[in-house]
Design a protein with these regions (language model features):
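Structural register within alpha-helical repeat arrays
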Residues: 64, 94-97, 130, 162, ...
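Catalytic glycan-binding domains that act on GlcNAc-containing polysaccharides
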Residues: 95, 111-112, 116, 281, ...
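Solenoid-like repeat scaffolds
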Residues: 48-54, 78-88, 99-102, 112-121, ...
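N-terminal leader/linker segments that initiate helical-solenoid repeat arrays
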Residues: 25-96, 426-443, 452
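Residue at a conserved register position within TPR or TPR-like alpha-solenoid repeats
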Residues: 68, 101, 134, 166, ...
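Bacterial N-terminal signal peptides
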Residues: 11-20
Length: 681
């Protein structure tokens, strides 16, 4: 469905359009036809003409300056950008120069930009560049004190410079506190470490070196740990060497760990390395027993790190058919961060309910998870399983399912709606509120200018910073309106995800209906909603996305996979075209369809295989049973997937699928249960 949408007044103002153009129908020339219920791409020519205070020639000069700065040609960039002055294109050009060239610009230039544009997004990045330049140029103590007068350092080098300036003016205690804080809590390279030691070595105590030693181990930075250990003693060196052996999987950790004294062996970093060593060498029961020995208060200092170990050990124990011990490992957590606490209590409750048939005890854990949960996904999961536990005890579960069902954009919210027999998905439109003030924000003006210049990667950087900075849901929704107006699905989704993290969900903006070429969708061998669901999870609609493993484009295809699919669909293979949206989706949809076919129609197996590969899926079928045979609860099967990334991936794709069916087809029935049960052996 294609409709025209008049942009909100604040957006008109942000673009600098004359008020006369804001009358009904006056913007038809600016906004094109779009798919769904939001405007899509703004025509570049009209956008350039409409934005205030600069010409199309200025915009072109900005683009050329950006290219020059990215290429490292500061002189050319300056020659192009200087005539732009303080216009938005001029500000953007200088910002890009700071981003790309950093200390080459000099401290004075960077600090001047920070002073002149305190509201420009990415302040932390620019302060980092300024501090690096300040240190490189050995600025005077007066300049250093002035720069840090209202803000604390963001780099270890900046902290050292400030501490030295403090010492020069007699503020020895403040300087010492700052040095100790950065020494114990931040990782930095050996040359800077030596500068810290030269200037403040006498102020660093054994406890400060031990904190740095711990930070190196907990961050799995063996070099930092070894250097810190050498300042502590031979035993700590032995533990650091054992840590490196575990990180590098050299097989020599056992001998080193056996040499530790009982005192050091019972310190938190030693527990961490001993447990990780046991887990990585498949001594899972021993790892579980050691986890039970850590004092709760001690573990709580790094509760998140130790929860990761507990989660991995607990799931291994389930694979070994030891659910009682798995429960004890999960329930014994000392997690402090809310997401970790929620996951830990869910895991403990799920083991009790589904593996040990103890619904009353399970309910206590689900209650704890529900009490702590904040995000829609975690709230829906906790309350859904509260309902399952209540049912298992013969009690009315309706109120729990109703609570979960309110979060219709989530996997467990949809399962709750299906359990209640409800139709439709409650994905609301964005919140309303006064947002005209946004047009005055320099970051918004810069964003509109970057879109007019088709600098989308830079625009996304501003978008992400603004999404964390804007004060309320109405402002975030308005920002998403702007990115939607420019047809930037990746930016719109990024805003929605950040909004959800901030507990300010935006509803419909979280599921863009643009960003995928319609022609490629029309030729897909699988339902279009499925392609959207995978794309949203794979690349978040970024056509240029490239993973660390080499997967590319909207549907994140590995070149080898894409080559096979190209041969099968009868198109020439060109690895360079994998970032072309049409080409990528054509091959990606073919691959997805083939996976569904290979798994005899099973969606959950195909989704898992798309993420983790068919080989792993076949291993999981052997280990946990086949969810297609009707004897295995597919909900439990998904929860048994040992890879956290893949387990989360399957659930997110399935929830995306339901929403996109609703948006694309106006489908009211919820088919998530059918999707879980699809396929024949």
């Amino acid at each position: 469905m294609f409709i025209r949408v008049k942009p909100p007044t604040w957006l008109v103002l942000a673009l600098g359009l004359a008020p006369s153009l804001a009358c009904a129908g006056g913007l038809d020339g600016l906004f094109g036809l779009v798919s769904g219920n939001k405007t899509a791409a703004i025509s570049h020519a009209n956008a350039q003409a409409g934005i205030a205070n600069y010409s199309s020639a200025d915009l072109q000069a900005m683009k050329q300056a950006i290219a020059a700065y990215k290429a490292g040609d500061i002189a050319k960039g300056d020659a192009l950008s200087t005539p732009l002055g303080a216009s938005i294109p001029g500000v953007i050009s200088e910002w890009v120069a700071i981003r790309t060239q950093g200390i080459q610009l000099g401290f004075d230039r960077i600090s001047r930009f920070l002073a002149n544009y305190p509201d420009w997004p990415t302040q932390t990045m620019m302060r980092r560049r300024a501090e690096e330049a300040l240190v490189a140029e050995k600025q005077s103590h007066t300049v250093i004190r002035s720069f840090f007068a209202k803000q604390t350092p963001v780099t270890a080098g900046g902290a050292l410079a400030l501490a030295e300036a403090m010492t020069a003016t007699g503020q020895h205690a403040q300087a010492t506190d700052l040095i100790r804080q950065f020494w114990g809590n931040n990782l930095f390279k050996q040359d800077l470490e030596q500068k810290y030691l030269t200037s403040f070595g006498e102020s660093l105590r054994k406890i400060d070196h031990f904190k740095r030693f711990e930070r190196g181990i907990f961050s799995e930075d063996g070099d930092v740990a070894l250097r810190a250990a050498q300042r502590l003693g031979p035993e700590e060196v032995t533990l650091a060497k054992a840590a490196v052996a575990v990180f590098d999987k050299t097989g020599t950790a056992d001998k080193l760990l056996s040499a530790l004294s009982p005192k050091l062996a019972n310190e938190l970093p030693a527990y961490f390395i001993r447990i990780k060593n046991l887990r990585r060498t498949d001594r899972i029961t021993e790892a579980a027993n050691l986890l039970s020995q850590i004092p709760h208060g001690l573990e709580a200092r790094e509760g998140g790190l130790f929860w990761v170990e507990r989660r991995l050990v607990a799931r291994k124990l389930l694979d070994m058919n030891q659910p009682n011990l798995a429960y004890k490992v999960a329930a014994g957590h000392s997690a402090q961060a809310i997401p970790d606490k929620v996951e830990a209590d869910f895991t403990a409750g799920w083991i009790l309910l589904r593996m040990l048939n103890q619904p009353e005890q399970a309910q206590k854990h689900f209650d704890l998870a529900a009490k702590e949960a904040k995000t829609p996904i975690s709230v829906a999961r906790a309350t859904y399983w509260q309902g399952r536990a209540a049912e298992a005890m013969g009690r009315n579960a309706g109120s729990y399912y109703q609570h979960a069902a309110a979060h219709g954009g989530t996997y467990y919210g949809q399962l709750a709606r299906a359990r209640l027999g409800q139709s439709g998905l409650p994905i609301p439109n964005g919140p309303s509120g006064s947002v005209h003030h946004l047009a005055q924000r320099i970051g918004i003006q810069g964003l509109a200018t970057l879109y007019a210049a088709d600098e989308r990667s830079l625009a996304l950087t501003l978008v992400n910073d603004l999404a964390y900075a804007l004060p309320d849901a109405a402002s975030l929704d308005a920002l998403a309106d702007l990115t939607t107006a420019y047809g930037d699905a990746a930016a719109t989704l990024s805003i929605a995800k950040i909004a959800t993290q901030r507990n300010l969900p935006l509803g419909q903006h979280a599921f863009p209906l643009f960003g995928i070429p319609q022609q490629a969708l029309g030729n897909a061998p699988i339902e279009q909603a499925f392609v959207y669901a995978i794309t949203r999870q794979e690349s978040a609609f970024d056509p240029q996305a490239t993973s660390t493993s080499g997967a590319k484009g909207l549907m994140q295809l590995m070149p080898a996979t894409a080559k096979i699919e190209a041969q099968k669909v009868g198109v020439d293979f060109d690895a360079n075209r994998l970032t072309d949206p049409h080409y990528n989706v054509t091959l990606g949809a073919a691959h997805l369809g083939r996976l569904v076919e290979n798994f005899n129609g099973s969606y959950i197996l195909a989704i898992a295989a798309y993420n983790a590969g068919p080989g792993n899926v076949k291993k999981w079928i052997d280990a946990f049973g086949d969810p297609r045979d009707g004897k295995i609860d597919p909900i439990d099967w998904v929860e048994r997937i040992p890879f956290t990334e893949t387990r989360n991936y399957v659930q997110r794709v399935l929830e995306n699928l339901q929403v996109y069916r609703s948006k694309l087809n106006n489908q009211q029935s919820i088919l998530i249960v059918n999707d879980l049960q699809r396929g024949n052996r």
